[in-house]
Amino acid sequence: LYLPNTYMPTDNGRELSERHMTRRDMGLPEDAFVFCCFNNNYKITSSEFDIWMRLLNKVEGSVLWLRQSNQWSELNIKKEAQRRKVDPERVVFAGSVPMAEHLARQRLADLFIDTFSFNAHTTAAEALWSGLPVVTKTGQGFAARVAGSLLNSVGLPELITKNEHDYE
């Protein structure tokens, strides 16, 4: 099987929940821009986190919606937001839900912002399947090029950046 633009086939049988979800249901503001990153928290480095906090400062009222991992990472992330002069309440965590609901709730976000050293893999495919655009920064190694591969394969190369300045 030859895959010219990506190494990772995905299946088109994943169902999105038909349950009506609102931003309020997810603890998100109804009228704000929602940046989202559902990658595992251990993929977040200070490089992208600094950019994300600058984005929150630039986009009035916006929030960052992250995957809930454990209480320690949540506390540390909120503490780091505050250290960067961002109200920690603007960082919202998404708890675990069944896959169909997880896929559907991504439609409540406006933009998926990727991590750098270890891009979203399946997470990017899920976001794209849900209709959520993904912005990534391509790197040198395999793990830092996966989201770009997926974006190329769906015809969205303009969402692939080559440096932090363009990503921001």
Where are the language model's segments positioned?
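Short intrinsically disordered, low-complexity coil segments enriched in acidic
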Residues: 1-5, 168
